[in-house]
Structures are given as C-alpha cells and as structure tokens.
Amino acid sequence: MARWKRETGGSDVAPRRRGVLATGFSWLLVIAWAAVIFSMSAQQSTGLSSGFTGQVREVAVGFLALLGLAPDSFSVICHFAEYLVFGALLANAFSCRLGLGKSFLLALVCASVYGAGDEFHQYFVPTRMCDPLDWLTDTLGAALGSFACVLALRRRR
C-alpha cells in the first residue's frame, strides 16, 4: 500500500493512464488557453473596450450593476474566471500521468507562475499595468479550478 501511494503521488486513487491522443489533446487545450490569456493581456486596455469585447463588457457590467456590484469587479471576475479554466485544464492534463494530489499541486504552481509572468508582461503593454492583486486573483481562480477538476476526476475513478 505504501508503494502504491508513493507511485500515485500520495493518493489512494490510481492515476488515469490515458492514451497518447487524449493526453496530447489535454495539453493542446492547455496551450490554447494559455495563448488566449496571453493575447488578452497583450491588448491595450482601450482595445478591450471596443468591438465585440466591449459589447460583452457592457452587458456584463450592466448585469453586475443589477447584482449591486461595482463595475470595477468585472476585471476581477474575468481574471478569476480565466484562471479557473486554466487551473482545471492543467489539473486534467497532469492527471493523465500523475496522481490527483500531484496534479492539483502542479496545476496550481504552474498557473500561479504563468499568472505572475502574465502580470509582468502587462507591465510592457501600453495602458496596462502589473498588479499583484490580479496575480493573487489568478492564483485563487486556478486553485478553485484545479481543485474542482481533481474532485470531478476522483468521482470518475
């Protein structure tokens, strides 16, 4: 039993050994989502207020106002949501070959490091800034996303 736990990252649940195709697809989704995050961060804040993105923002801010939330909370919610998805995708990809405990921790660390790098990247984008609170929000979103993914995978196994 101790050997089993050691091989599965301390989990009583065996790692799901998926095929090469499923594993590759899981990592492709991670890379695609990381590219979405990077491209959103590379846009100037004025670019996020126009076109389709601006229309989505207007509707969302209107909805937040109905809930009694400040329009500034839209940015926080977006950061949280994009990293919630990122954390879940990372945990799923890591779980192809690792136990659930290690998958959760690696997903959280990778998403947090990527979030820190993303905030640093925004420092060089005109009209954007590097905000440690955004990084914290990213990390919290990734924690919830990876935890939810691990719980769902645990139920499946």
Whereabouts are the PLM-identified features?
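Bulky hydrophobic segments
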Residues: 2-124, 132-133, 139, 143-157
